[in-house]
């Protein structure tokens, strides 16, 4: 390995320039002999003094932005000026401009950027109003500009938040309000309590504002706003604050809620935004900004944190309870029995209610502390505010990262590429129950493919920034993961989790729509290589190819003909290990041989498998399973051998937990009774698979469904969404009617988008049948009638459950397991 000595200022400058231009991180490997030795890319750098790791290269400009300013907790934009706020409470005005990029020099004020990417010219403005006028004009020629001035500043100048800080350092005020109504515009609306938990410099301060101590709630809110300005927190957090708390306070304050730094008011956006939950569901809200502070809505934070969609509800109290964060002895309040509007004048009740509310801020702060670290540390690299990190999708964050990597050096930036559909990964299962199943997977398959096969867009990304950053994040994550395991220090685990988010999102970013640096062709290439790797692995194990065949043809021979495909095993067998394939799923496959292997045997098998692949494509031991039940493609049940279990994979009795894979098995909306039925049937299938016993179990639930005593066991969970609130289909209308009935009966006091509700299927008399929108009649003119099925809240249960519906649901649930139930 070539050595390079730093022995004067010029040699120091040369190596610093190399590090900056190539976006590499120098690694100190030795300084025991008085010589500082660093590994930089593929050569060794030596110096008699610590010349490399100084402020100039402390933060890799590709990863953290070129500006090394530390302890930034917020950036504000006001009156054509930018303000930078630091953790010590200081602030300064910093230079910055607004800008529009174009593909041509549309007038002499457009200046040429470096490089050959699409947006080659930049027009900069000192006036925000002039910029807005120019932006409106730029739509005619397809110009590009940042979404907001603050992100624009960060993209152009390389600022990022929280450099040199840890997640617990910024000051945080968690708050919650109690009100008399659900809508601040209704008669009798009033904010009666504001609970606060402030953490600043490691010290917790709690304060409760009570409307009874003021002449009106407006005067209380003004006093609270004054207190917020005095305490000067960098972060405001609360649960569902965008849609409820801040909106309510804003209205009740006369739309002049001055809680920002430099005496600035809260500002709501004119147009709605959407917080995405998953590919099919999002929540509409109006974004709010507070000058010099970040607003973190812990409901949105929970949505981003709950990747596995395990929360039964996104309400604050249910999440706190589910996560085991509830304060011991915490007072609970029954709002139905004692609504806020009726207890304010009852001194004893009010005293109890105050005690209940005093800890409300603690709950939001507990969620913040648990969930924020990964986003906090990722924010040190991504040129967005912390608030934007929570409210936006990962693809947008990576895109900003990539734009910054070029624009901060006045380099032209890319134009988005139209996304196209492409073939995905291989998934197939051979139904049946298997014993002693080996499972192998490729660690970080898609990122590994990107690096191994050099997958990046040579035209859009000429300096290879995407792959360089991916390599750096991968290497740093491995170091932090190892440090976390060796030391048990949470900081390292938080860092590696942040890095994991970006690493695992790179592939999805390439295939996304509307992003400057997307690369759909590259995403297709990655999945193609992924399929090749899986096919090669399966052939090594079984000697058989997996081939794609037509599963179904719709409208055959017509213009709108549509074919669906499936993967199956070819009959041809070649020399191999002679194993039997069980399942294939994206980055893994499982197989069986004779008996349970020893750990040494399995290790040798994996070594043999890895010997036929490139170094970065590494197959790993994903466990040996005592039982695996494959139902269909992407739906299977796993029970590990105890010897292969980590402590967290054992239940309270020390037995291996059962893992369910697939939508049919993990449906979170399934009724509790049917979830229970599925669990007991799975247990029986894995422990005997006795057909008579299984039939007896099914009959037990059929009997319960015909005579329901506890309707809560038969309720389905639904999320109250905009589509449900505004929809005109039967399900949406049934939900709207159920909500209206519950509000009128005061079963619920309010409902808002994102709330989880539980409903059961009921019968309310009869209604005339319809077909294609028309009422149906018998030949003699009599109307054809059917049951009038509706949805109801369980609190309104009147022994009116729909027996036929629930018997059908039992049948559907049992049929999920039909392929593996013993039929002998």
What is each PLM-predicted segment?
Residues 1-22, 28, 337-444, 448-453, ...:
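Common nucleic-acid-contacting/processivity interface regions adjacent to the catalytic cores
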Residues 206, 211, 232, 236, ...:
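Active-site-proximal helix-loop-helix substrate-binding element of RNase H-like nuclease domains
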Residues 589-604:
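Catalytic palm subdomain of template-directed nucleic-acid polymerases
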């Amino acid at each position: 390995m070539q050595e390079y000595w730093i022995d004067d200022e010029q040699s120091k400058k040369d190596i610093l320039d190399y590090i900056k231009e190539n976006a590499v991180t120098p690694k100190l490997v030795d300084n025991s002999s008085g010589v500082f030795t660093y590994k930089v890319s593929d050569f060794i750098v030596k110096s008699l003094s610590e010349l490399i790791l100084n402020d100039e290269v402390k933060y890799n400009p590709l990863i953290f932005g070129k500006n090394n300013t530390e302890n930034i907790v917020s950036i504000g934009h006001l009156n054509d000026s930018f303000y930078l706020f630091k953790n010590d409470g200081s602030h300064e005005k910093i230079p910055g401009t607004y800008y529009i990029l174009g593909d041509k020099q549309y007038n002499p004020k457009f200046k040429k950027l470096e490089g050959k990417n699409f947006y080659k010219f930049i027009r900069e403005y000192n006036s925000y109003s002039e910029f807005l006028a120019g932006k409106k004009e730029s739509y005619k020629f397809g110009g590009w500009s940042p979404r907001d001035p603050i992100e624009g500043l960060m993209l152009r100048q390389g600022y990022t938040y929280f450099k040199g800080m840890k997640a617990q350092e910024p000051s945080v005020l968690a708050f919650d309000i109690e009100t008399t109504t659900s809508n601040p515009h209704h008669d009798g609306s009033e904010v009666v309590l504001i609970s606060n938990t402030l953490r600043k410099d490691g010290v917790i301060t709690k304060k409760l504002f009570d409307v009874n101590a003021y002449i009106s709630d407006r005067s209380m809110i003004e006093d609270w706003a004054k207190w917020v300005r005095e305490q000067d927190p960098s972060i405001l957090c609360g649960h569902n604050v965008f849609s409820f708390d801040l909106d309510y306070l804003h209205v009740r304050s006369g739309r002049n809620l001055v809680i920002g730094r430099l005496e600035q008011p809260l500002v709501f956006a004119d147009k709605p935004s959407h917080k995405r939950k998953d590919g099919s569901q999002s929540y509409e809200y109006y974004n709010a900004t507070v000058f010099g502070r970040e607003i973190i809505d812990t409901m949105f934070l929970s949505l981003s944190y709950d990747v596995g969609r395990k929360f039964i509800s996104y309400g604050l109290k249910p999440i706190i309870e589910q996560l085991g964060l509830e304060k011991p002895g915490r007072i609970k309040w029954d709002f139905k029995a004692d609504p806020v509007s009726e207890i304010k004048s009852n001194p004893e009740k009010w005293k109890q209610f105050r005690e209940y509310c005093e800890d409300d801020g603690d709950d939001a702060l507990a969620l913040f502390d648990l969930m924020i670290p990964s986003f906090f540390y990722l924010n040190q690299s991504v040129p967005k505010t912390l608030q934007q990190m929570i409210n936006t999708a990962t693809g947008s964050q990576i895109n900003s990262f990539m734009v910054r990597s070029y624009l901060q050096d006045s380099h032209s930036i890319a134009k988005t590429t139209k996304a196209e559909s492409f073939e995905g990964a291989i998934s197939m299962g051979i139904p049946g129950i298997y014993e002693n199943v080996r499972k192998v997977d490729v660690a970080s398959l898609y990122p590994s493919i990107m690096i191994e096969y050099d997958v990046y867009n040579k035209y859009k990304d000429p300096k290879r920034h995407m792959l360089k950053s991916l390599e750096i994040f991968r290497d740093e994550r491995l170091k932090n993961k190892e440090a976390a395991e060796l030391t048990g220090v949470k900081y390292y685990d938080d860092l590696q989790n942040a890095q994991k988010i970006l690493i695992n999102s790179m592939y999805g970013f390439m295939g996304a729509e509307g992003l400057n640096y997307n690369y759909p062709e590259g995403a297709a290439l990655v999945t193609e290589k992924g399929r090749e790797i899986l096919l090669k692995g399966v052939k090594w194990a079984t000697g058989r190819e997996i081939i794609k065949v037509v599963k179904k043809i719709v409208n055959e021979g017509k213009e709108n003909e549509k074919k669906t495909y499936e993967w199956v095993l070819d009959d041809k067998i070649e020399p191999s290990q002679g194993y039997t394939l069980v399942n294939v799923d994206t980055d893994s496959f499982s197989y069986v041989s004779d008996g349970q292997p020893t750990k040494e045997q399995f290790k040798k098998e994996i070594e043999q498998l890895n010997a036929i692949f490139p170094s970065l494509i590494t197959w790993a031991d994903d466990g040996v399973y005592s039982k695996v039940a494959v139902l269909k493609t992407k739906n299977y049940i796993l029970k590990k051998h105890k010897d292969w279990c980590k402590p967290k994979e054992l239940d309270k009795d020390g037995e291996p937990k059962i893992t369910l894979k697939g939508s049919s098995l993990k449906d979170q909306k399934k009724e509790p009774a049917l979830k229970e039925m599925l669990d007991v049937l799975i247990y029986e299938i894995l422990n005997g698979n006795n057909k008579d016993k299984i039939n007896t179990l099914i009959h037990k639930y059929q009997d319960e469904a015909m005579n329901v005593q506890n309707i809560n066991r038969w309720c389905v969970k639904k999320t109250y969404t905009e589509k449900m609130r505004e929809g005109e289909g039967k399900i949406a209308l049934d939900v709207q009617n159920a909500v209206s009935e519950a509000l009128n009966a005061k079963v619920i006091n309010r409902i808002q988008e994102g709330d989880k509700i539980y409903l059961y299927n009921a019968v309310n008399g009869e209604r005339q049948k319809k077909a294609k929108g028309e009422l149906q009649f018998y030949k003699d003119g009599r109307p054809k009638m059917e049951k009038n099925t509706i949805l109801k809240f369980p609190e309104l249960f009147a022994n009116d459950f729909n027996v036929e519906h629930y018997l059908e649901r039992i049948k559907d649930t049992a049929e999920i397991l039909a392929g593996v139930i013993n039929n002998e």
